[in-house]
A protein has these predicted regions:
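Short, hydrophobic-biased segments on the C-terminal half of alpha helices
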Residues: 46-51
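Beta-hairpin "wing" of winged helix-turn-helix
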Residues: 55-69, 74
Length: 107
């Protein structure tokens, strides 16, 4: 198993955060929610959003809010498939790490 704890972990977390809202959510809220889970600079997350959009995992649209446009992100079907793969890999990865931390042997 090869769970990349760098870019893939950020991608997985962002997809998980965005997928919680059926109609999508806006960039600033995504950064705040992600930062509740992991300590990452806000400036790191906007390139992640662009990468996920470019990979067709997120779709983007603008909506008026207080007289200004606010950019929203919504998970695509491809994004949901990718998130499911990340969730499966994470479950296996974290299970093995937990087993190791608890003194078990890895098979």
């Amino acid at each position: 198993m090869v769970f990349n704890t760098g870019a893939a972990l950020l991608d997985a977390i962002v997809l998980a955060v965005v997928s919680r809202e059926d109609e999508g959510t806006y960039g600033y809220k995504i950064t705040q929610d992600v930062r509740k889970a992991i300590d990452v600079p806000e400036s790191t997350l906007y390139p992640v959003l662009r990468r996920l959009q470019k990979g067709d995992y997120l779709e983007v649209y603008d909506r008026q809010f207080d007289g200004r446009n606010r950019r929203y992100y919504k998970v695509t079907e491809s994004g949901r498939t990718q998130l499911a793969m990340y969730q499966k890999e994470w479950k296996e990865y974290s299970g093995k790490i937990s087993e190791l931390f608890e003194g078990g042997r890895l098979e």
